[in-house]
């Protein structure tokens, strides 16, 4: 995160409605040993801007916002490209924002406030506020780097079928739902795992820490 301090003149407004989906990437040692620290790869967020004049005039916003594009006939939102933090924002007339390309959740928050600050500077007669920021879903990606091995998903399913759904003829991935966790994991024979359904990075890490040693027991030589 590049920015941690904000001047008192431009302190963040109160927060009230933002949702985010975060992608996490885990790096694993070559022998599929201990997982190194998780790294947030991409955040997709949605936020709501409250404005004293609603709906927002997108033509006006496009004319005053730098690095923005607006083609009403093709898409009903202004596209704003921020440099600091580096991300892309879609702003709709309803006040809804969709943010993509953020590196972490705090960057997503800063991007929301950056858009509002820019609008305040260029629309001095309007009251603007971002109104609750929370993570709604986290998507994690894990690659075990099995090299000359694969995961025996058929055996994994036979021995853990209470927690699994697996129909190889319809989809190559095994769906794993831990009994005591809301996290859902999609496991592929190649060693790639997609983790979703968590509300925090800690939940993702706990779920993966529980599954990781179990998965290693189902490695077999690649045929």
Task: Label every model-predicted segment.
Residues 1-184, 190-192, 198-223:
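Intrinsically disordered, low-complexity polar/charged tails and linkers
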């Amino acid at each position: 995160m590049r920015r941690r301090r904000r001047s008192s003149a431009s302190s963040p407004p109160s927060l009230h409605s933002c949702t985010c989906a975060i992608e996490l990437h885990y790096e694993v040692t070559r022998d599929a040993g201990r997982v190194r620290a998780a790294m947030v790869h991409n955040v997709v967020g949605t936020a709501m801007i409250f404005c004293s004049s609603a709906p927002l005039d997108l033509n006006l916003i496009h004319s005053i916002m730098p690095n923005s594009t607006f083609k009403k006939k093709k898409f009903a939102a202004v596209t704003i490209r921020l440099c600091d933090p580096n991300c892309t924002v879609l702003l709709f007339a309803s006040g809804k924002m969709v943010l993509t390309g953020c590196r972490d959740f705090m960057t997503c928050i800063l991007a929301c406030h950056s858009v509002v600050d820019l609008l305040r500077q260029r629309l001095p007669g309007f009251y603007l506020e971002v109104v609750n920021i929370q993570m709604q879903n986290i998507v994690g990606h894990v690659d075990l780097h099995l090299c000359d091995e694969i995961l025996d998903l058929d055996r994994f399913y036979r021995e853990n079928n209470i927690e699994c759904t697996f129909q190889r003829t319809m989809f190559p991935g095994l769906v794993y739902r831990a009994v005591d966790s809301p996290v859902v994991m999609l496991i592929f024979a190649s060693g790639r795992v997609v983790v979703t359904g968590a509300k925090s990075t800690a939940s993702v890490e706990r779920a993966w820490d529980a599954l990781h040693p179990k998965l290693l027991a189902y490695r077999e030589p690649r045929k």
